[in-house]
């Protein structure tokens, strides 16, 4: 009989199927580990690609402008040739990255099957727990007793095979025992010839001299003990050999369970030797103790006095049989209990207790092996004589359920490894105190969101660091949300939900932006939330149907974040999501990383190596993380959608290919976005800040509010990974399939969302938990109707991106003192900010958002928005609104005034990132970022949507059915240059997003658009004229300057650029808002 035959016979035939499934799962897990490594290797390659793309992007911008400004056909031809070559290299890199996305989809699919297998396995085990015979051993008839006797014999056989397998199927190694016997024999001779070994010394000499007979008595007693010990060791060798021969494995079994035939012998499981009887003598003996680890001896009795020891003898680094066959904790010792062997540990441990108690630790061969309690059962039915009870107790107490550390303990273990692979990290997983917690979650074993950091081991979601001390993405107190709000405070949400875009599109991707082609931040039906869950995925994602990234009271909360209760379906909900395999998007105190987050180590709204998490953590504020104290991405919903999240049914906040990240970047994106190596909201070294993203000390967030007074989706997805941001390698905030949700899982991936391959922002069972529960059943990112929808998140009618801040009243994307993206700059490098290497959003000669020849706010390919547009759709802009956008009242969604500040930023009624009549894109009536009637980032009625759909409309959010947060292809200006707006500043004192000292706003204001001190209208200007600057807020200026901003003859609106290019927004020949309404080609 093979081990499988024995197992099947002893338990139930259907278990064989479960065992096979578990074996398959094991293979899948190993395969996935390899794939994780491969993916990390690809990340390194992608980082190299990203650096190359930065250069290529700048080249493309330069050549494109040169083609446009060429004075002769020959000159034009030369530059066109250079431009074609550059585009070809960019395409090669993009193709390579798109392969990663399809690979990710495959992994997601595989993980679904894995989950299915686990569920099936649990089903197979149900009959054991429901069997009355097991529950009521006293009410059994004679036939049942006979049947149970046989069953015990079979179980005994299972144990025998199990032990042999535990030793790799190899014969016992007697080297230690033989060595011990030799030493004992030598000792015997010494004692015999020289007397009792401890009879020396002055006291001994006197003693021996006075009482000669004592010496002889001691010697004889010791000789007798030595002989006994020699015999016991010899018996042990004999028993071990006999046992091995009885339960020998076949070659195939040996291959499967550890050692191949011919392999060196595995280290044998140490065997216990009984403690020798103490010698009655006052003289201490030193020879009666042994150093071998106890192991059950193979006696034929049913009880034993040896203490079982858990030891792993698997020297091949292969899973032990226990894990292979059924799981357990993976420790060989666990496996030594048939229950666990067959059923996978905790799942069946109840049954063991029901059969007879005990946690299933193996006391010894025989009846007790099944669990101490089985002895009680056996006695009750007459199988075992009651006289053996004392020994039984002595042996088995230690296996008692309560005493066992919950290793197989009923309740505690039930979802401790609810699925060994996911759940926010093997050890912490939504633990009450650490989940996303003190030590790892949000940053487990492999990183999640960043190869090396994301939720680093010690802080991510750690109790004390959340959003580094220097803050980052939010400042000391808020980070991506800030202490009180972040990512969806009660009043705003999706604050900078997607600002920060990718190479091609900004916060969305080439084809969609924060929403995808069809919607944005919500999708046609669900907006930033989806019909049922948003930012949660089909079932829950980032919260799931019932909870998601937050919940009314805790979100990513203090104690359970990412986990206290962990429900299978709420992901990023009550217990997980926003956590990922290793977790992410969480952590009590750190969130959004120690030094960079929303930017990564050196750059890009995410950082070279990490993602939405910064070196050590990720997306999560002290109290609420990725959600805000009360709601998270909206009280009731959250970035996501039934299928997509933060976007259309198919894409949202990412789009099939990108969104909130885009295929290649966005919100960090591979090449830039809010922090490309050389430009875009950051630059390699400063990204959104001098040194790290959104400012030296804080990041896209500011001390108190991060992206808004209270938060603003903090930088909900700025925050991104190399390719994806807030998500995984390939999907930001989700990736192709999950970005901030993605088609299937939103903010995390189908199964893990904002979290990792297996568990989304927290793991299957725990999600961005929150103090009380994260992702309350009724609100978390999931209400059917509001999700990022009617009532809030990314587009509430009254607040979204909220009433009080969203990139808001005081700063947005910046601390009060540090403002927007960094102490020195934000949204840009010291020299370039929000864009070009040297200028970005504000250099006198070269700024973005308006330079005569060259601006950025996106750059040709990225511009805070994407290749084709950003900062506004053709027909309905974003980032603007007559009164605020990103503003005092809301942004990204207020009925009458949205996004971009009281005066509005990046979109005042009269100017908005451009002149009333010409900005961005040069079209008089039609530009982005500024047309009175028609731009994104600023239309009176539509801004980031339309009254009905803005990033939050009941039906589509994010703008228009087809474009979202701006143009079909972009967005980004808005949220990106919302970037301030606030009544008091946005835009650090030193400002950012602008000149060396001011960035997008002038010394005192910065991309603040509308600040009391004006911003953008500064003497030093920024992003625009000498006197004005991307201020988008001065009543009449912004881009209205002599040199103009976002609308000059030669710029913005570069061929491939934003704000007016052939393909873009802001009014080009093909996109004319009036004609296309943001449905750019």
UniProtKB/Swiss-Prot annotation:
**BP-aspect Gene Ontology terms:** cheating during chimeric sorocarp development
- Where in the sequence does UniProt note compositional bias of the Low complexity kind? 284-313, 396-410, 422-568, 576-602, 614-623, 633-644, 662-672, 680-733, 855-869, 877-888, 955-975, 983-1026, 1034-1081
Taking the record's annotation, the residue ranges forming a coiled coil are: 18-131, 173-242
Biased composition (Pro residues) is annotated at: 267-283
| Compositional bias (Basic and acidic residues) | 22-53, 411-421
Q: Which domain of life is it from?
A: Eukaryota
Locations of Acidic residues compositional bias? 748-768, 778-832, 840-854, 889-954
Keyword line: Coiled coil, Repeat
Region of interest: Disordered:
22-60, 250-321, 388-1081
Q: What is known of its domains?
A: Contains about 100 repeats of the sequence DGENNQ or DGGENNQ.
Name of the featured protein: Uncharacterized protein DDB_G0290685
Organism listed in the record: Dictyostelium discoideum (Social amoeba)
